[in-house]
Amino acid sequence: MTKHVAVLMGGWSAEREISLRSGKACADALERIGFRVTRINVDRDVAAALVAAKPDVALNLLHGRPGEDGTIQGLLEMAGVPYVGAGVLASAVSLDKEYMKLIFTAHGLPIAPYVVVRDRDWQPGPGAGPAAAAAERKRVFDAIAELGFPVFVKPARGGSSIGTSKAHNQAALIESIEAARRYDPKVIVERAVAGAEIECAVLEGLDGAPPDTSLPGQLVIEGGEEFYDFEAKYLDPSGSMQIPAPVPAAVIDEVRRLAAAAFDAVSCQGFARVDFFYTADGTILVNEINTIPGLTATSYFPKMWEATGLPLPQLLDRMIATALRKRPGSH
């Protein structure tokens, strides 16, 4: 019997356009291999759309909130619709970089030093008074100074590098924090790591087996960007990925081990992409986990799996089959 897949895409986050591109690429691929597909351009009436569609399984490709923070996952759980990917808890903690880092640290995974700047740290309420507000701002600057410049400044709960920038001094830091706060009142400031950016794709293991990992890829940026920002990811034709990453075999093995460990640390399911830094002295640092990586025609998640021997149609078929085998509530 032909399975019916609801592909959820769009939404209202800053990553809407990327989600639509991922949704189209996957819906087209699923139709080519025989699935019946309903494309749902998600708005506030998504619950009604799901009820009307009556799918066998949902493929959630919403980037950012509400698709990656556990909200849509909770809706699907309540509706009794099996779905591909991480559950409510794993989605919520993985999207919030503060809690993601706390979990990684608790599991012994290596990460770069960072500082969390909360709304009340940066902009205390009117009752605080000018002196208290200035003291709180100084505390933030002192904590960041211990990281040392340059630093990366990111919205705590965002993706596709939207709102992320690099600051080389305090004046630029203020601008970067204000820019990140336009997307999230909580901001993460990380010590900039000089090194290669490496990514590894992960799939939930079959029938309870450990996670499977792809050959890692190394990002190659030739357009002059200081880091792999939104433009480099989606708009710059000079950006590319070398698969497998041009690093020693032992590093490939360790990246794959750490990717699986990060996947398990947040209790992820389905699929994810784990990003790393690899420095000249051989240090490997986990940067973050993305529980709904891009699946556009040019995205690196499917490219890494294709290089590992699993093209997009077969990749999606496996992801759907894994979701359909889950017991209700097993997320």
PLM ranges: what are they?
Residues 2-8, 235-244, 300:
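A short small-residue
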Residues 1-106, 118-139, 322-331:
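ATP-binding N-terminal substructure of ATP-dependent carboxylate-amine bond-forming enzymes
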Residues 168-257, 283-285:
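Phosphate-binding site of ATP-dependent enzymes
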Residues 3, 105-108, 248-331:
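ATP-dependent carboxylate activation and anion-phosphoryl transfer catalytic cores
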Residues 1-9, 52, 93-196, 206-207:
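Active-site nucleotide/adenylate-binding loops and adjacent lid/helix of ATP-dependent enzymes
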Residues 39-43, 187, 191, 198-199, ...:
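A short glycine-rich, hydrophobically flanked beta-strand micro-motif that places a catalytic Asp/Glu
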